[in-house]
Amino acid sequence: MGLKLSGEDIYNPGQGALGDAVVQFGGGCTGEIVSSQGLVFTNHHCGYRQIQSHSSVAANYLRDGFYAPTLRDELPNPGLNVTIVEEIVDATDYLKEYLEKVGEQDPLVYMRRGYLRKVAKQWYLEHRGALKAGVALDMAPFYEGNRYYLFVKKQYSDIRLVAAPPSCIGKFGADTDNWEWPRHSGDFSVFRIYTAPDGSPAEYSAENVPLKPKYYLKVSGKGVAEGDFVMMMGFPGTTNHFYTPSEVRERLEVDNQIRIDLRKVRQETMWEEMMKDEAINIQYAAKYQGSTNAYKNAIGTSWAARKMNFEAVKQQMVDRLLAYSKQYNKPEYAEAVAKIEAMVKERATLRALAKIYDEGLWRAVETAKAPLIESEEQFAKLRDPQAATQWYDEVVLGYFDKDYNKEVDRKVTAAMFKAVLEYIDRVTEGQELSIQLQAPFGIRRWMESKGETKVLGAIFDESIYFDKAKMVEVLSSEGGEVAYALDPVTLLAFSVREDMKTISKALSEYDRDFALARRTLLQGMLEMDGEMNLWPDANLTLRYTFGKIQGYVPRDNVYYGAQTTMDGIMEKWDDASPEFYLLPKVVDIYCNKDFGRWALPNGKMPVNIVATTHTTGGNSGSPLVNGKGELVGINFDRNWEGVGGDIEYLPDYQRSIILDVRYLLLVLDKYLGADRLMKELDIVE
């Protein structure tokens, strides 16, 4: 197809290969090392929280962009980690032997990543020796636990912000264009990995030096054209290619619909407040973006699943397995299918309640997630006023931090209480629940007896959580436990947590049988089709996908090409819109055609491209390389028509949306004036 690399060029543990330049950025994104000094490219939205954390009204890097002219000006980001996979080992046989040795047979135990990491540490001790500083281990189940792979990784924790475009470039189109093609976003940010002077991973220190990587990507100044071969590497999060028909229905009618309905309420309230005040807009920018991203994904997945009739597609998959089961006398495979279908139906109401609590309270009402004092021992320690003061400063204010706004939370809470109560009534109508829930009863009784204004006033105006002196006084006083327990925020947060535990416990009754049935289902699929014909579902481990640059037909008589240009930015430009405004310098670059050597042969400036590669959440920031392994783009999204690919790959519709690296180079070169970075990059024509 156009690949000019050998297997060892792509993965060659210890020797330096393409895979060594691919990093897991934070907990849910990908990035790539692009220089001999540890420079990392990822998406603007992957670095958004870091950019936001360094922003203020006086120095608004979200709005204006950021560039560090020297190494000394690069900004540290506590809590941000970057990991590089150094070795991948098939650990299936080792795990089986280990489980037999310790007598562990419960899949709910041994399929957990935490348990598997303990097994990985034992493997490392036996095969590599003592665990070295900076080494991180992961072991993950594949094919629902029919295979296990172990990942030896190097983890770096001194990661500094180097450059970021203004949001009018990095987030152009914002939520309106999210999941959409054609697209015109310069969705990138630049960081650098630092190490101790000896090259080992280290916490932030002024003495640290830029990483000297085993391998880094050269950057193609030539770019790509329609039909060209491309390959992508990254850490995709979750896919569900082996859903049964009932699981498809559950995803659409329960999971997605509840997420869509409740996030819409939250987002509309947040947006109204964000548009009133620039400071609030900065505070809630990342929260809003995170919410809308999953919201639009749910809408797109449901649309695709219905349009492509995924339920029927999965029925065909199941029918093939049932026929195989009958032909080869393998009744366990038919039994597994029947168990899955039955359990999905039985757990429907509990599943709906879990999603309502998660989307409507836990993720939406910030006071519902407030830190609690949950033991007598902890309370006894906090009787000391000094300890209580320290707990308030570090824990309470650590949660209700600079990105929290009480008035925004007040308005969101009012909207969510109403929406959640209505939703619970709807999904439980005519049913006698096997569990008792505290929060809905308490909130309803509270609202009916006191009224909405007084209830919200009690939470946000009277709670000791928002008054340090009162909190310390209560905690350090005799009998303070009672006053603390009766505080409105304590009551809300405690009841929500207890209800979620109750629901989770009831749902967990299905977990073991469900996990075993899923494993048997996949065992049958592997036996029937062979491992080389089935890719395992994504699980945040390093994966490769290949394809070509290619447009698509989204509907009758409409064709979307594979490349967009700055012409499209100017067509969408609207300074009255917070999503499509442009800073004057961007307009000047376009009007003066100041594109340098990054323009297409026809003089137009490339911005985004699409490819047939198969991606999902976690692939944000993934490097797109040509057949020679040179960086040609950075993945940042998928198209609306292809979002359902998490359940069933759609080659005619599904496209990865990618930042053309030539637009990134233009922004660094012409907008940010990042001369030292341009010299640092290895740009090939």
Feature names for model-found ranges:
Residues 1-685:
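Terminal presequence/propeptide segments associated with secretion/organelle targeting
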